[in-house]
Design a protein with these regions (language model features):
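Secretory/export targeting leaders with adjacent low-complexity proregions
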Residues: 2-234, 242
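Conserved helix-loop functional segments at active or binding sites
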Residues: 237
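Hydrophobic alpha-helical bundle architecture
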Residues: 241-247
């Protein structure tokens, strides 16, 4: 256990805003008995700092070797720049669920999340990332929008949702709609294994920089991850497990 005063930056954060987010989460989470009481308390205060300090306990985390340093990954909502129409600048499609994608429990789709497509009388695994990218004229693929950066589109798929600022000035929210059934593979592992980026320095920014230094290899590296994510237009920003908007 540690006092909140030992958490660097805790009291510098906007804890009143954090309290408002907590209240919204309580609309769903208060159904859990262990959270019902604290959710009720939250409705009767606007003092975020006092609320969290009075109702929660901070703990310091250690790994199995008693080290107190480690890596915690977090979600971020990507912002891409795009257009509803394909242009010379905006040429990378953000696809909807393909028209030919099917769900089936046939043996041929074992290991592919039961996701495939019908070819003749057979149901086969759905196309890999490389195959999808090589066939932009596929009539089964329809774009929600087009964006100007292939690498940013890749990381939009990794995150599963994000925002596209259109050339009209409007913001388009896109959310996860489905996937091609292929296994996700981290391209970060490629950079670490090939000693291009150290394990300690790996990040989205570091990966982008490394890709841009080797433009001729971008497609080959991105295609290491055969998984391809499809999107839908969303009414709001990204939601979490409680189906409330992440902030």
């Amino acid at each position: 256990k540690v006092p909140f005063s030992q958490i660097k930056g805790f009291f510098d954060d906007d804890l009143n805003h954090a309290l408002e987010v907590f209240k919204k989460d309580c609309q769903k989470s208060q159904r859990y008995e262990e959270l019902k009481n604290v959710c009720q308390k939250a409705q009767h205060t606007n003092d975020g700092a006092m609320f969290f300090v009075s109702n929660f306990q901070a703990y310091k985390l250690y790994d199995n070797n008693s080290n107190d340093e480690g890596m915690i990954t977090g979600y971020y909502e990507p912002l891409l720049y795009g257009s509803l129409k394909k242009t010379q600048r905006y040429k990378y499609p953000v696809y909807k669920i393909p028209k030919d994608l099917v769900l089936s429990n046939v043996n041929s789709l074992q290991g592919y999340k039961n996701i495939g497509k019908k070819v003749g009388k057979k149901i086969v695994p759905y196309d890999t990332r490389a195959s999808i990218e090589k066939n932009p004229n596929n009539k089964n693929l329809e774009a929600i929008a087009y964006v100007d950066d292939k690498i940013d589109l890749f990381f939009l798929q990794v995150q599963g949702s994000g925002k596209i600022q259109l050339d009209t000035g409007e913001i388009l929210n896109v959310g996860y709609a489905g996937q091609n059934g292929r296994e996700y593979k981290s391209i970060g592992r490629y950079f670490i294994d090939n000693e291009i980026i150290s394990k300690e320095d790996i990040s989205v920014q570091a990966i982008k920089e490394a890709l841009l230094k080797n433009p001729s290899k971008i497609d080959d590296i991105l295609n290491i991850n055969e998984s391809y994510v499809f999107f839908r237009v969303a009414d709001q920003g990204a939601t979490g497990a409680l189906n409330t908007v992440l902030t």
